[in-house]
Amino acid sequence: MSEYKYLSGFGSHFSSEDERYPNSLPVGQNSPQVCPYKLYAEQLSGSAFTAPRTENMRTWLYRKLPSAAHLPFQPFKGAEYFSQNWDEQPPNPNQLRWKPFDLPPKDGKNVNFVEGLHTVCGAGDPRSRHGLAIHIYSCNGSMDNSAFYNSDGDFLIVPQQGVLDITTEFGRMSVAPNEICVIPQGIRFAVNVDSPSRGYILEVYDDHFVLPDLGPIGANGLANPRDFETPVAWFDDRDVKDFQVISKFQGRLFVAKQNHTVFDVVAWHGNYVPFKYDLSKFMVINSVSFDHCDPSIFTVLTCPSLRAGTAIADFVIFPPRWSVQEHTFRPPYYHRNCMSEFMGLILGKYEAKEDGFAAGGATLHSMMTPHGPDVKCFEGASNAKLVPERVAEGTQAFMFESSLSLAVTKWGEETCQKLDAAYYECWQALKNNFQITKN
């Protein structure tokens, strides 16, 4: 996997050919009467044809057989806990915390990426192209002779344990913990693993993930475009006679059989592509004077809504950094938010709650549900000597923040048996320190 090659950039128009078949891209046009090597030309659209040029997304694929060459789709009976039913549980406004989600049992059958999808929470409706879902994947087997694609939206995948070897129609990429990848709507992919693997998925229905505007930060900072990587063209030259394609369509899974692999794209060009990003390359912005900055300064990617400055979903990280603020309570402040905050932990311990929030687990603080540092964190930070120090060293926490009110599935609230009923206790020992006279 380390030998995989990539194209650098975000939102760029790329061109790529499998090096085994040079000159496989048509010259000067997209759809010649006969394509080089007698390939089929197929356009994959990620936006309306008439979308503004700055937002128009599409890629031309040159493949051995068109994607339409398959048998009819039938309901797929795997992935029992992959759901888009937001009404199966009553609303729960409490602070929620999950202990690390289970990996597949060592003595059980192999579970691949699709079979190991479990939905935790979400909102909206993929049929109206509005909303999101948050899933956990837990797998110990590879997707042999099969592929998956999402008709409903984009997947942002956050590995927490185990390296994902992902084959897409565009080529191959390796995604390890502390890296992420995005598979846009409709792009077919397969996940191979060589050890038990677990991670988080943010699925958005509305639009695609983009880089946040930088405003007064300037032209550089946060996640820089040059650090995003898109795989180079590669096709599977095996003669596969029994292949299945799994589709997520209107919130449900379907499967179709065909007598050839979908990974037969010899060349492609366009700007609608899968990509990966190494979170260690994020350029952190922080206060160098006083006060705790809002977490929006840690935004890696965003899926914007129609309301200016308000996201359907933001992907935010809390990376290792220097903390130097003077006369300041440095950890995250106590908060009631008009947004929903789902947090996960990839590595180490989270700075505001070192106890109880473990790697592979999660928290959900719903709209206007109060949250903030636990007693240990508050007392420690209130009395700490304020010297420059490294924080979050050896850790990587992240947040999926959304303007939508998220409903928790039955699997998330009951079946997984990971919900920590004692979470609320971390705030119960907070004292009333009010003094009539100022400090």
UniProtKB/Swiss-Prot annotation:
EC number(s) from the headed UniProt entry: 1.13.11.5
Reactions it catalyzes: homogentisate + O2 = 4-maleylacetoacetate + H(+)
One record GO biological process: tyrosine catabolic process
Keywords from the named record: Dioxygenase, Iron, Metal-binding, Oxidoreductase, Phenylalanine catabolism, Tyrosine catabolism
Sites where the protein binds Fe cation: 335, 341, 371
Molecular-function annotations in GO: homogentisate 1,2-dioxygenase activity; metal ion binding
Needed co-factor(s): Fe cation
Pathway(s) per entry: Amino-acid degradation; L-phenylalanine degradation; acetoacetate and fumarate from L-phenylalanine: step 4/6
Pfam families: HgmA_C, HgmA_N
Family: Belongs to the homogentisate dioxygenase family.
PANTHER family from the UniProt entry: HOMOGENTISATE 1,2-DIOXYGENASE
Name of the molecule in the record: Homogentisate 1,2-dioxygenase
